[in-house]
């Protein structure tokens, strides 16, 4: 057993981050199917809040609910009636449900996938007119209420719209839902205002914690779902802005772009398309980005691991290591910025949706890294699994050597604290594993897809076995890497190992 102790060096890095004015820091992305090398739709998110925040990966089984039973969010008092029957779905919850469940992302048994949410906030003028509702719908409840209740992505968007209209939103959020017909991108703008669009197949997007929608055709009911008063509220708040004679949602609802959102928007776009004309000084970044390039799953993984490679910026968390002291709140430091891959990442997920994968399997694969993928691998999971590996289910709020999250967290801490001796050895091995799994995944998915038609139960058992075996082998390897890093880390002047 390895005793988990964090060195002063690591603590100084994490403390530096806590001093930043980044109260939430998820980064989402979408790559339309016309822009991928294999025709798959790619979308996902890094879930960011703070270091050392345990996440689980579980499956919530289908169930019938008694009449009148409600979902209750203990973190803010939100309640909503449960459906007569809840569909099975996978989830990535927190381990402190009294502070919010935060199921975050997963597939349901109907082939709907969801990532919820990228937090955002309307400007002060908007909030005075349509304030957020304390016990309204929040990220903490989003996936838990929607995934067990809907058969299509559009139904999911419509249900969110209904709840926000009737009960209000507790906060601003960006939500993505997808199925065999494509992906919806939704912005919950203020207490009762929202806009959702069917995302175009020939565009890509990178979206950290601010709103991005520009002009939307509200008359296009097939591809748009919006609240009735979204323009009226902006006009009443005197924050209404037009671009080229048309209402611009983001410019009307957003506060000024902050440095953390600027750095992640810019670096994310540049990660996917180095030839993009965006600059670090742009006043805003459009949601729908165009390119003549095509992308792979590995490009999406690279995006979520981005730390300004190839750009004239350094990650903010390196400041303590570089001897420049702790960053001061709300004060930019030249040359340093907030990266997509940062110490606050608690998990990262990528949905890879393909037309030839049945809805019973989720219509695709979720590639998941519990813990930051900076030095950990993405593992593939189909949407029909019924259980997950035991290391994903440890609920400790402190280091636990049986926990996937805490093991990865420790590995990341060790590599961050000792970059010179450890270098890229760990991540290089992780990328090698991912390359093998990507090559294997099409074959195993085809076999399970063929089986699900004749024997859904056998298909589920096979998907379970493959994913459980892979997770068990990978976790054993992660434990071996963790032990080796502890053994090889530099000693201090007294000859003692520094954790």
Curated annotation (Swiss-Prot):
Active site positions, chain numbering: 26
Keyword Amino-acid biosynthesis assigned: no
GO molecular-function term, one example from the UniProt record: dipeptidase activity
Record Pfam families: Peptidase_C69 (PF03577)
This protein's name: Probable dipeptidase B
GO annotation, biological process: proteolysis
Enzyme class, first EC level, given as a word: hydrolase
Keyword Hydrolase appears in the UniProt entry: yes
Domain of life: Bacteria
Gene3D superfamilies recorded: Penicillin V Acylase, Chain A
EC number: 3.4.13.19
């Amino acid at each position: 057993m390895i005793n988990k102790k964090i060195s002063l060096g690591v603590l100084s890095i994490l403390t530096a981050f806590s001093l930043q004015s980044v109260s939430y820091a998820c980064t989402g992305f979408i790559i339309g199917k016309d822009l991928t090398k294999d025709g798959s739709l790619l979308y996902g998110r890094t879930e960011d809040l703070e270091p050392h925040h345990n996440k689980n990966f579980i499956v919530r089984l289908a169930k019938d609910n008694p009449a009148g039973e409600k979902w209750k969010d203990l973190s803010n008092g939100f309640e909503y009636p449960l459906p007569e029957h809840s569909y099975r779905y996978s989830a990535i919850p927190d381990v402190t449900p009294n502070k919010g469940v935060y199921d975050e992302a997963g597939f349901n048994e109907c082939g709907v996938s969801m990532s919820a949410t990228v937090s955002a906030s309307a400007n002060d003028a908007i909030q005075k007119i349509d304030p957020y509702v304390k016990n309204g719908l929040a990220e903490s409840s989003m996936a838990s209420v929607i995934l067990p209740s809907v058969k299509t992505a559009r139904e999911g968007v419509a249900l969110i719209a209904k709840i926000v209209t009737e009960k209000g939103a507790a906060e601003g959020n960006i939500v993505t839902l997808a199925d065999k017909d494509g992906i919806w991108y939704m912005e919950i703008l203020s207490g009762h205002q929202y806009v959702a669009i069917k995302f175009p197949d020939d565009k890509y997007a990178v979206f950290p914690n601010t709103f991005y929608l520009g002009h939307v055709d509200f008359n296009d009911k097939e591809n748009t779902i919006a609240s009735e008063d979204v323009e009226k509220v902006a006009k009443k708040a005197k924050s209404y802005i037009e671009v080229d004679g048309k209402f611009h949602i983001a410019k009307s609802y957003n506060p000024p772009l902050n440095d953390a959102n600027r750095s992640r928007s810019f670096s994310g776009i540049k990660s996917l398309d180095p030839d993009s004309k965006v600059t670090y000084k742009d006043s805003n970044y459009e949601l729908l980005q165009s390119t003549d390039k095509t992308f792979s799953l590995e490009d999406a993984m690279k995006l979520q691991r981005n730390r300004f490679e190839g750009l004239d910026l350094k990650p903010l968390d390196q400041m303590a290591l570089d001897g420049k002291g702790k960053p001061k709140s709300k004060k930019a430091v030249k040359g340093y910025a907030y990266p997509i891959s940062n110490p606050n990442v608690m998990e990262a997920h990528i949905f890879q949706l393909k037309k030839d994968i049945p809805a019973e399997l989720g219509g695709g694969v979720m590639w998941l890294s519990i813990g930051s993928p900076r030095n950990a691998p993405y593992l593939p999971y189909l949407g029909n699994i019924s259980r997950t590996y035991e290391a994903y289910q440890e609920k400790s709020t402190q280091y636990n050597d049986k926990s996937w999250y805490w093991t990865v967290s420790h590995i990341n801490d060790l590599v961050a604290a000792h970059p010179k001796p450890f270098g890229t050895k760990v991540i290089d091995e992780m990328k090698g594993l991912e390359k093998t799994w990507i090559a294997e995944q099409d074959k195993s998915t085809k076999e399970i897809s063929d089986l699900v038609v004749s024997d859904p139960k056998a298909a589920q058992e096979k998907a379970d076995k493959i994913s459980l075996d892979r997770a068990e082998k990978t976790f054993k390897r992660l434990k071996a890497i963790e032990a080796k890093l502890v053994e090889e880390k530099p000693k201090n002047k007294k000859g003692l190992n520094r954790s």
